[in-house]
Regions:
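N-terminal small/polar-rich segments of proteins
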Residues: 14-80, 111-232, 261-299
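C-terminal segment of classical bacterial N-terminal signal peptides
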Residues: 5-14
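Surface-exposed binding patches on compact interaction domains or structured appendages
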Residues: 72-111, 226, 233-259
Length: 299
């Protein structure tokens, strides 16, 4: 009697494909100009702020996320973000959180006919609210590459965002030249931004600096992102109008500590003083003169 044994065996190779995070999905450094809103970073690295934020002139740039897939099998693979939405938490002392969703991947399908590394770009939408304080926000989204033959590979891609405080400015003291006694000649009175004191720079015989009311420099308090610099813009001239008629011009505006730039301290606070020159005409009418001037600060 002959017994025939048939032995069957499968010979295969374990899939050694890899999926690695190469570049964070970064929403950059943003300054909210609204209480809430969304910002989109595309898979091409373009940003759409929707008018809800401005991009800070310094700090982290925005860019799309990248993962690298290195296959060892010739196959068709599907790419997706396994998380529909994630929460980024503020790692700074301010607290708060933001949400990131609407993840996009490019390419979303891979037909591997030649082995080699493939980079996959990741985009998404970040939504902030009034409770999203300044600071650095971090989290991660899970990216998957899968096929029926190879199974599923996944990697956690870091997602980052930095929010700065928006700038706020308040006038605490008005720019005031005090009381001036004038004669028939023209003169120019300068108000020093640092000291708030007046001096006659032209036509000294035509004006007396009365001590009845103290002059004051314009004083402003600025609040913003700690340890940053802001630009300062002062007007070239403004016109004051008298209650009995007549006008006078203010020009040569100057700021202290600077007319062009201001550094905010570790608490985000800064102080700016403003002075100017008052041009008094030869036949200037007496009275009380008032006007407004603008001060602009920007990151």
């Amino acid at each position: 009697m002959t017994i025939l044994f048939i032995l069957c065996c499968g010979i295969g190779r374990a899939d050694a494909s890899t999926l690695d995070a190469r570049q964070n999905l970064s929403f950059g450094t943003l300054i909210p100009v609204a209480n809430s809103g969304s910002v989109i970073v595309s898979t091409a690295g373009a940003v759409n702020t929707g008018g809800n934020v401005t991009v800070a002139p310094s700090g982290t740039s925005y860019y799309q996320g990248k993962v690298r897939f290195t296959p060892t099998l010739l196959n068709v693979f599907t790419v997706r973000a396994a998380d529909s939405s994630i929460v980024l938490n503020n790692t700074s002392s301010g607290g708060g959180s933001v949400t990131v969703d609407n993840f996009t991947v490019n390419p979303s399908s891979l037909n591997i006919t030649v082995l080699g590394a493939v980079d996959i770009n990741i985009g998404g939408r970040m939504t902030f609210s009034a409770s999203s304080k300044s600071g650095t926000y971090t989290g991660s989204v899970r990216i998957e590459v899968s096929s029926l033959l190879a199974g599923t590979l996944s990697v956690n891609l870091p997602v980052t965002l930095t929010l700065w405080d928006s700038l706020k400015m308040n006038e605490t003291t008005p720019l005031f030249f005090g009381v001036l006694e004038i004669s028939s000649g023209a003169s120019v009175v300068q108000l020093n931004a640092q000291t708030g004191q007046r001096s006659v720079v032209s036509g000294s015989g035509n004006v007396v600096l009365s001590t009845g009311q103290a002059s004051t420099a314009g004083r402003f308090k600025i609040k913003g992102q700690p340890n940053t610099s802001v630009s300062v813009a002062l007007p070239s001239s403004v016109v004051l109008t008298g209650n009995k008629g007549g006008t006078m011009t203010l020009d040569n505006f100057n700021g202290y500590p600077s007319s062009t730039q201001l550094s905010l301290d570790s608490s985000g606070d800064g102080n700016l003083n403003v002075g100017a020159n008052l041009n008094i005409g030869a036949s200037q009418l007496s009275g009380t003169y008032n006007g407004t001037y603008s001060v602009t600060v920007n990151y």
